[in-house]
Regions:
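Formylglycine-dependent sulfatase
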Residues: 42, 50-505
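Bacterial N-terminal signal peptides
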Residues: 32-42
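Bacterial N-terminal signal peptides that target proteins for export
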Residues: 5, 9, 13-34
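Intrinsic disorder/low-complexity segments
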Residues: 9, 22-23, 35-37, 51, ...
Length: 505
């Protein structure tokens, strides 16, 4: 067996120790998340060019400029230096990251989908689309990787927070020497806010007792309004405003997604009214279309009868439209669906009726998410800020969820509690008219997940297949992105996030 010579081994260990010491010395260095807006802003400016020349922005917090000692004997003759204040540069863009939940490659209509997504499509027609943007196969890892620019294992988020363990890389506890986008931008002069789903804090740290060191405000978002876990009841959510649990209105028309959009709009307006020269960063993450699929009936009615043809026909229709739009090569072959997914024509009439209803509610939920996202985008346009706002619209944090198993669930919790009646067809048909209402907590049959992940085979959780890890992305920035509706097939990953950066810079 080959053995490393003693001297070489000693030198290797010295180098390793040296690297460890270097890492320790730089524990407060922020992760350079490879987002285009960081490069474009050149990390900002401050009061006066003379100060800027003395500022080192490779380490955060930014240290103030050095001033020579004031030796004037008479204080009346002494001249005070200018007040140091870290500011983003003039015309630095606002930044908005939109991340939907549990929807895959065949979701938006711009990517061949059969569900209406007008806001995504509008941005796509005016911006740059990516058809090879990759996420991880699960919620928490994707979100942590996106915000830190680290491999999700390096950020201790190897799996979702609910099943975190004490094994290295899987604790669900962000290391103290890993920074987030919120911290990086806030320390460079941005106002920062996060709305909606978080799902990045270990479950034993999300009670009102804390500890709060890995909550959104400590990562460091000035404002947070949302839920900390992987899902919540959209009619009666568990919501936190910053560190405080809040009671939502006792209103039959209340829906969290509408509420979070309104909160984001109000914050943007308030921030701009007080500090119009200060750019902002908003992370907007609806709970849709993660179960429970809760949505008002007015949205469901739009899709009545739209899925009666079944998942096989819908899957093929999405596939053909994808080829027509050019988001997949024209010679692409539709992958075989999993063997466990029955052909639609082999299902009973009862099964077809129930499953079609499940898809109608799912589609309505996605449509609502896109609509509420559009409300936030509209306020940017109304304020004259849209042209200089860099928007990343990420259509899903992984593939579409097949966690509704073969028959779907009227109440997702029946599955987790091993209640067999929860997936019984006759039992669930009792809730046909109520599907999506406050009396249900529903999920859909796995066959629909396969259809909405066309042209791939698998779905969320299957990291070895693109159906789980490839998601549509649109980058929109009218002031700097000149291409309109262009499609890029450059490979990109949620931790790098700067494919074809020359097109943005």
């Amino acid at each position: 067996m080959f053995k490393v010579p003693p001297d070489a081994e000693l030198n290797r260990r010295r180098r390793s120790r040296g690297k460890d010491e270097e890492i320790k010395r730089k524990t407060r260095h922020l992760v350079v998340v490879a987002l285009a807006f960081v490069m474009v802003t050149s990390l900002g400016s401050t009061v006066g060019r003379a100060q800027e020349a003395q500022i080192d922005r490779t380490e955060l917090p930014v240290k103030g400029p050095w001033y020579p000692p004031i030796t004037t004997l008479d204080a009346r003759d002494a001249k005070a230096p200018p007040v140091f204040e870290v500011k983003a540069p003039k015309d630095a863009p606002n930044v908005v990251i939109i991340m939907l939940d549990d929807i895959g490659f065949g979701g938006p209509s711009s990517f061949g989908g059969v569900i209406e997504t007008p806001q995504f499509d509008k941005l796509a027609s005016q911006g740059l689309m990516y058809n090879q943007f990759h996420t991880t196969a699960l919620c928490s890892p994707t979100r942590q990787a996106l915000k830190t620019g680290r491999n999700h294992h390096s950020a201790n988020q190897a799996k979702i927070t609910e099943v975190a363990t004490s094994f290295p890389g899987a604790t669900g506890m962000l290391p103290n020497d890993v920074a987030s986008i919120g911290e990086m931008l806030r320390l460079n002069g941005y106002s920062t806010a996060a709305y909606g789903k978080w799902h990045e804090t270990a479950v034993w740290e999300i009670s009102p007792s804390g500890p709060f060191t890995r909550w959104p405000n400590y990562q460091v978002f000035d404002e947070f309004y949302g839920f900390l876990g992987g899902e919540t009841n959209q009619w009666a959510p568990s919501v936190f405003h910053n560190l405080n649990r809040v009671e939502t209105p006792d209103d039959p028309d209340y829906h969290f997604m509408n509420d979070m959009a309104t909160r984001a709009i109000d914050w943007i307006r308030f921030q701009q009214a007080l500090t119009p020269d200060k750019p902002f960063f908003v992370y907007f993450a609806p709970g849709a279309v993660h179960a429970p699929h809760h949505v008002p009936k007015s949205y469901i009615e739009k899709y009545k009868g739209k899925f009666d043809e079944g998942w096989d026909v819908i899957r093929e229709r999405i596939f053909e439209q994808q080829k027509k739009l050019g988001v997949i090569p024209p010679d692409t072959q539709l992958a075989k669906k999993p063997e466990d997914i029955k052909d639609w024509n082999d299902l009973s009439a009862k099964e077809q009726k129930l499953f079609a209803r499940q898809a109608e509610v799912f589609a309505a939920y996605l449509h609502m998410a896109d609509h509420e996202t559009g409300r936030v985008i509209q306020v940017l346009e109304d304020m004259g800020e849209l042209d200089n706002t860099l928007i990343f619209y990420i259509f899903g944090d992984n593939g579409t969820s097949a966690e509704g198993v073969m028959n779907g669930l009227y109440n997702e919790l029946t599955y987790f509690n091993a209640e067999p009646k929860g997936s019984d067809i006759d039992f669930m048909l009792q809730y046909y008219d109520e599907w999506g209402s406050p009396t249900t907590y529903p999920h859909m049959a796995a066959g629909w997940a396969v259809a909405f992940d066309s042209p791939f085979t698998w779905t969320k959780q299957v990291a070895s297949n693109y159906g789980s890890t490839r998601n549509p992305l649109v980058i929109h920035w009218p002031k700097r992105l000149k291409g309109k509706g262009d499609l890029s097939n450059s490979r990109a990953l949620c931790i790098t996030f700067t494919p074809e950066k020359e097109k943005i810079s």
